Each structure stands twice: as structure tokens, then as C-alpha cells.
Amino acid sequence: TMEIARYAEKLTGVKDVELLKRHGKEVIEENFQNEDAVLDEIFLKAKLGEDEYETAAIITMTEAEAFTLYQMLKARGEEVHYIDRNSSAFKKGLTVTTFYLAKGLEFDQVFGVFRDIENPMQNQAKYICATRALHELYMYQVTKQ
């Protein structure tokens, strides 16, 4: 959507990109105190199922962060998929992965989950995360572990 493309432009500073003339929901940015609060919010916003979206992704900076969120979701009894460097398939539903393993994939909804730390790769990670979203993008920051 134009809203997601404009958000991605802001991350890179690149201007004058030709945008698709398809409007959608504004990008949502929020801060959370911990991962549990982030996961609660994701399940309020996720729209998966019949007459809704087919795919959603939680995208993180590192494999350790992705695997932690995946384990937390499994412990809650949620149906969730995990993509790591050994994965060979991408399934419908909710997927957890990293920004670099999400390259080349697209999801109806994307939930970017990033830590409140300075990292030279973080802007690039957020850009890749943003460009994976087809319809809705949520960028969440965890301020404490």
C-alpha cells in the first residue's frame, strides 16, 4: 500500500519512488515493556482465518529473538510456524522469523518486533520488515527484556 511504501521510504531516506496507487491502513508504531505485552497485542490485531488474511508474520532482528517468541507462542498453545535457515517451506497462518530470512517472502500482515537498542543494522532490518507487508504493518519496540 502507499502507506507502507511511504513508511519504508522514511526508513531509507530515498525519495521520488513511484508508489502503487493502492491505499490501506496506516502503519502502527508502538512501544511495549516486554515480549508478553507484544504478543498480547499481536493477537488482538492478527486477522487470520476464513474471510480474513491467509498469512501473518512476526519478524525480529535475530534468530534468538525469533525463537524465543516462537517458544512463547507455542507455550500459550498457539498455532504458529517458525522459519529458520533450515526451513524449506512457508505455510499459511502465523509465522515467526528474522528479517534476513523473510527476504523474498510476503505476508498479508507483518508485526515487526525490535528491541530498544542502537544497532547499525536495525534500520535495514526495519526496512526489510516493512517491505514484506502486503496489507498491514505494525512496528513494535520492546523497551525492556
Go through each PLM region and give its residues.
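Conserved interdomain hinge at the start of the Helicase C-terminal
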Residues: 29-54
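Core RecA-like ATPase module of SF1/SF2 helicases and allied nucleic-acid translocases
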Residues: 1-5, 15, 47-145
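Conserved coupling/interface region of RecA-like P-loop/ASCE motor cores
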Residues: 1-34
